[in-house]
Amino acid sequence: MNVLEKEILFIISRLRCLTENQFNKLYNYKRDSKKKTLRKTLRRMCNDYILVKFPCNINYRGYKENSYLYYINGSCEYYEGDDLIKTLIGSDVAVRLKLANFEMVRFYRNINIGEHNYNLYIEYIDNFYIIKSICW
């Protein structure tokens, strides 16, 4: 298993699912040759039954996603409907925080804090070492 495959498994294990567009954003591949190696790696991981790939076609209030969705094979939860939309938006926020060089401390979905119920809760440390959170 090479370094790219290990990074992909680590990220998907933390976020539960990612789309192909989010992989491209995360690894910032602008040249076609690097994109092809990422696609080949994802295809190889699907053929080896490490990942499961599903088509994804979502249009939710300006958030559009038409690429493929990747899960770890054998994970206990596959999301559908509103849960899938919440999961993808949460994954997209986490990818953008990682691209901004913020350190993620906690990443939760469907959590109760006190009397409040949140669909998404992300706690991170910004570049000035201040702990901040995103609740939705």
PLM region descriptions:
Residues 1-78:
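Nuclease-adjacent, charged terminal/linker segments that flank catalytic cores
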Residues 45-48, 77-85, 124-135:
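Short, Lys/Arg-enriched charge-dense amphipathic segments
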Residues 53-56, 85-90, 133-136:
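Short, surface-exposed, charge-dense and proline/glycine-enriched linear segments
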Residues 64-111:
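Solvent-exposed, charged helical/coil patches
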Residues 96-136:
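Active-site metal-binding core of divalent-cation-utilizing nuclease and nuclease-like domains
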